[in-house]
Amino acid sequence: VKSLFRRAFIIGRRFRIVHVVHGRGRDHEVIEVSTFRAYLEADQADQVAGNEKTSKSDLVGKTHVVDASGRVLRDNVWGPQIEDAARRDFTINALYYDPVTQVVVDYHHGLKDLKKQTLRMIGDPATRYREDPVRLLRVVRFAAKLGFTIEPATKKPMAEAARLLDNIPQSRLFDEMIKLLQTGHALASVAELRKQGLTQLFPLLAPLMAEPGTPPSKRTQQIQFIESALADTDKRVAEDRSVAPSYMLACLMWHDVRERWQAAIEKGAHAVPALQEAIDAVFDARVGDISGRGKLAAD
């Protein structure tokens, strides 16, 4: 692919894809090109004792690896389109458009589910969640963003499978939280997390995980502030305006920052350095090195 296009760049180490740049300036478009991958049975994979956090050295030179819980850590094997479709999570994500024949290839009745506005997992849902627990969050994100109904068999294992997210690196969970809040349906995403019983995944969202229907008089100023910020974020996305992760983090942590800041001022600290110290302390306590300060600072 790279040899066909002048402005093409190979991306990735584990599984390489090609980014082809079309157009120039602000109007340029990046087209992602990847190869179909084979569907591999978990019982045919090499198994490592730990997880992705503890087994990096065990992954060297291997193409198909699962951890002790059954999560797929690596599956870099080329395959035909029909097997690539079987690897997808939802039926609506396994649709292939052939630009030559102008035909949509549908191996798993995705068009039918699309018309019925249904999220259905391909294969056995419990197994698919074990392969990649982050699929739980994709279910929530798609349901909130599209307004689709989660098919009963897809929904049934979700609460039990949530414990598998303990093995996911915090950096990836942080990124998934940001994705939920940047969909343009942040409030709906929070409601869906609550609806599916996934209330303990993101401590930063804990203030919003109260029971639905709480009277306005009992909704704290902190909750109202965060909900207002997320509503504003949803509005910005709807207007095709940018949303900075640093802004969302600031809104989520502002209540704690303000309390610490005011306490420092009451003890005689100067306002500006006290504010910076409060921000640093709350960031370290609530976020730590999850995403890296540089990434957020550049935002």
Language-model-detected regions and their locations in the chain:
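Catalytic cores of the polymerase beta-like nucleotidyltransferase superfamily
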Residues: 1-299
